[in-house]
Design a protein with these regions (language model features):
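Long, charge-dense accessory insertions within large macromolecular proteins
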Residues: 1-16
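Feature marking long nucleic-acid-engaging regions of large polymerase/nuclease enzymes
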Residues: 15-178
Length: 178
């Protein structure tokens, strides 16, 4: 995809194709920031790469995954927006308790096959803390300490998250966890 004017290398990036119903081209909402696309009638151009050689080169140099960090200021330009941030906030704010049945359904739906944190029991229901579930996707050995916009001290020690994750944690252009 490309959105003009092409002012920087992130104005044109390679996306993986998945055929879906409908007559419009779609891409993940989190990928809009580098294109400066805001859905007010923005025009995007789709370029189809013709040769195997060109496809290989584009995958190496132009994939979205290669442009998460902006060269302008070294921060993440692609990150959580809207529902991602709200979900992370609701999952980690306070002492969020999730019943084991719900956790199993969600982790099963995404194909999780790793180990689970230690379960706890509240009011006769077995479950997990929201921060423990979020910690499943944070790499072991990752450490971080910052204050969230809501004023909570967020500490990630060896991949274990404590505190409230908000835009400062996973937001585009602001995400400390990214």
């Amino acid at each position: 995809f490309n959105r003009q004017p092409s002012l920087h290398r992130m104005s044109m990036m390679v996306h993986e194709i998945r055929v879906m119903p409908g007559k419009t081209f779609r891409f993940n909402l989190a990928d809009c920031t580098p294109y400066n696309a805001d859905f007010d009638g923005d025009e995007m151009n789709l370029h189809v790469i013709q040769s195997e050689e060109a496809r290989a080169e584009a995958k190496i140099l132009m994939r979205v995954q290669e442009h998460i960090i902006t060269p302008r200021y070294g921060g993440s330009v692609i990150g959580g927006i809207h529902d991602h941030i709200s979900g992370a906030y609701l999952l980690t704010h306070g002492d969020r308790f999730l019943p084991k049945k719900l956790v199993m359904e969600v982790l099963g739906a995404v194909g999780w096959d790793g180990e689970l944190p230690e379960s706890i029991e509240r009011d006769g229901v077995t479950g997990y803390l929201g921060t423990d579930i979020l910690s499943l996707i944070v790499p072991t050995g990752f450490n971080l300490d910052y204050t969230s916009r809501s004023g909570d001290n967020v500490i990630v020690k060896d991949g274990k998250v404590t505190g409230t994750i908000d835009k400062r944690g996973i937001g585009a252009e602001d995400g400390r966890l990214l």
